[in-house]
C-alpha cells in the first residue's frame, strides 16, 4: 500500500529532537516494516501555540496553498491512504482532508487530541 504521511505538529525531518519527532519517525518505520511504501507528503508545520488569531488564519491560508501543491504532486500517482500523526487544536491538519476529498482516499489519524474546554473556541 502507498501511504502519504504527514505530521502537522512537527515534521519528522525537523533538526530539533523531540518525542513527537521520534514517535513520528517510528510510526513511519512501522508502516514501512508492514510492507507499505510511505512518503512524507509535506514538511509544513501548522503549529501556533500562542492563540494568535491572525497567525492562525495565516497558517490556514498557507496550509491550503500547501494542500494544492501536494495535490498537484500526488494526482499523477495517488497514495492509497493519507496518514496524519498528532494533530490538535494548536496544530490542525489543513492539508490531509483537502487532499483526501480530491483523491477520494481514506484519511487516517493517529494521536489526535481533543480538548472539551476548547469546544466553543
Describe the role of every protein-language-model region.
Residues 1-46, 77, 105:
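N-terminal subdomain of nucleotide-sugar transferases
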Residues 17, 93-94:
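Conserved strand-to-helix beginnings and helix N-cap segments that scaffold or border functional pockets
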Residues 30, 95, 99:
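Hydrophobic/aromatic ligand-binding patch that stacks against planar heteroaromatic rings
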Residues 54-74:
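Glycine-rich, highly charged phosphate/nucleotide-binding loops
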Residues 98-116:
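Active-site proximal beta-strand in glycosyltransferases
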Residues 117-121:
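Short, intrinsically disordered, charge-balanced linker/junction segments flanking boundaries
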Amino acid at each position: 500500500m502507498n501511504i502519504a504521511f504527514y505530521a502537522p505538529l512537527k515534521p519528522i525531518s525537523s533538526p530539533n529532537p523531540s518525542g513527537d519527532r521520534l514517535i513520528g519517525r517510528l510510526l513511519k518505520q512501522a508502516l514501512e516494516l508492514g510492507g507499505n511504501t510511505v512518503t512524507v507528503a509535506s514538511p509544513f508545520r501548522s503549529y501556533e501555540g500562542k492563540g494568535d488569531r491572525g497567525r492562525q488564519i495565516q497558517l490556514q491560508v498557507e496550509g491550503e496553498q500547501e494542500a494544492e501543491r501536494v495535490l498537484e504532486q500526488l494526482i499523477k500517482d495517488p497514495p492509497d491512504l493519507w496518514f496524519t500523526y498528532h494533530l490538535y487544536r494548536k496544530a490542525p491538519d489543513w492539508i490531509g482532508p483537502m487532499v483526501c476529498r480530491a483523491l477520494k482516499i481514506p484519511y487516517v489519524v493517529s494521536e489526535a487530541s481533543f480538548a472539551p474546554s476548547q469546544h466553543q473556541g
